[in-house]
A protein has these predicted regions:
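M14 metallocarboxypeptidase catalytic domain recognition
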Residues: 1-3, 9-408
Length: 408
């Protein structure tokens, strides 16, 4: 393999770029990581994109796109640095689907050693509520476009002074690790209550709402139709739920084109899924929030729709550093802290609404894999990484509640 190294600024470590020795024999859809400082070259790369997996806002910040393999020569001709993330995204999806079709007898004994669809996750959180009814209960907080329940598992909340907290995952359908991480966090909090003092203290002093699958229609569609589907299932093209909230709605990083992956919907809160979250937050007066996504290994705080610093920027930075540090301690995976807009502008996000309207301390966490060291997985993260990613997510949730209790 040919090897090239490119260092970028902004405090990000040098990135190592691996290239194919030669292109594939027939055109395929390939996910690549691009780094370019020149806006014209960046625009050229983006014009070739069939899909955008991660975006870059800082100068020189790498971004991941999907292109036809026969477009790579165009990038080379314009001296645009790129590296392969997933050599053939459709082959990766087929391999994953084949693995998931294994008979039940051949599946791992550990439920979190493999991915699960919406129905299986729904059954699992229902079992958690039945396992510990004195401290866990399951609630349908709304229904999706296609009528699927949006399940929220309530854990704790027995004390009058319990901190109302929300964690949610899978606003974007293809981000399977977010569904598994939120479910795994809930599982750990329920099952470890009697044996882990830190967990017991958390549950006793928190009213935690866990919504593992915000986008059940899109998530299920990604299992049976299009592994890389992002939006909900409104009409033919869907709506990006994380562009459908009212703060900054219609702003940068969202589109009025319904075919775009960041289509914001006809108006703010046009979708039943975002309405369900809004109503839950207002009803329960949620004070602390984490929106789990993938991928990138990032801890992000408001604002995303504007470069204007948040009123509580120093507080967000200090607490965000606590989260990143807690996550690092678990498996020595580094999560990078930044204001959301530094990554890329995005109007109408849940985290901005949680902070700007609900006045909650809200973070977005982009889970594994990272986007700095040439990782080659994208959204199809190997199942053996579910447990360690869950450990990192749980560490962040515990650290956030602790910081809130300390008045930070």
């Amino acid at each position: 393999m040919a090897l090239a190294a490119l260092a970028i600024g902004c405090g990000i470590a040098a990135i190592v770029y691996w290239r194919w020795p030669s292109p594939p024999s027939a055109p395929v859809r390939v996910a690549i990581r691009v780094a370019c400082d020149d806006p014209a070259r960046c625009a050229l790369a983006e014009s070739l994109a069939l899909d955008v997996w991660t975006e870059g806002g800082r100068p020189g910040l790498p971004f991941d796109i999907v292109v036809a393999s026969d477009s790579l020569a165009v990038l080379d001709a314009h001296h645009i640095a790129w590296t392969v993330v997933v050599p053939d995204i459709d082959a990766a999806a087929r391999d994953e689907a084949e693995r998931l079709r294994r008979p039940a007898a051949l599946r791992p004994a550990d439920w979190f050693a493999e991915y699960h669809d919406y129905n299986e996750i729904s059954d699992h959180v229902r079992q958690l509520a039945q396992l510990a009814p004195e401290r866990a209960s399951l609630h349908a907080i709304g229904a999706s476009v296609e009528g699927r329940p949006l399940w929220a598992l309530r854990i704790g909340g027995q004390r009058a002074d319990a901190t109302p907290m929300l964690i949610n995952g899978t606003q974007h359908a293809r981000e399977w690790i977010a569904a598994m991480t939120t479910t795994c966090i809930a599982d750990h909090l329920v099952r470890a209550y009697d044996t882990n003092a830190a967990i017991r203290d958390f549950v006793d002093h928190t009213e935690l709402w866990v919504v593992p699958v915000v986008n059940p229609d899109g998530y299920q569609y990604s299992w049976g139709n299009d592994r890389y589907w992002r939006k909900n299932r409104r009409g033919r093209h869907g709506v990006d739920l994380n562009r459908n909230f009212s703060i900054g709605w219609g702003g940068p990083g969202s589109s009025k084109n319904e075919r775009a992956e960041n289509y914001r919907g006809e108006y703010a809160f046009s979708e039943p899924e975002s309405i369900a979250l809004r109503d839950l937050v207002k009803r329960e007066q949620v004070a602390v929030h984490v929106d789990f996504h993938s991928y990138g290994q990032l801890v992000l705080y408001p604002w995303g729709y504007t470069s204007k610093p948040a009123e509580d920027r120093d507080r967000f930075a200090a607490v965000g550093d606590d989260l990143a540090s807690a996550m690092f301690v678990t498996h020595e995976r580094r999560y990078t802290l930044m204001q959301s807009v530094e990554l890329y502008p995005a109007g109408g996000t849940m985290a901005d609404w949680m902070y700007g309207e609900a006045r909650a301390q809200s973070f977005t966490i982009e889970l594994r894999p990272d986007r700095w060291s040439g990782g080659r997985q994208g959204f199809v993260l190997p199942p053996e990484q579910i447990r360690p990613t869950c450990d990192e997510g749980l560490a962040a949730v515990l650290a956030l509640r602790q910081a809130h209790d300390l008045g930070r």
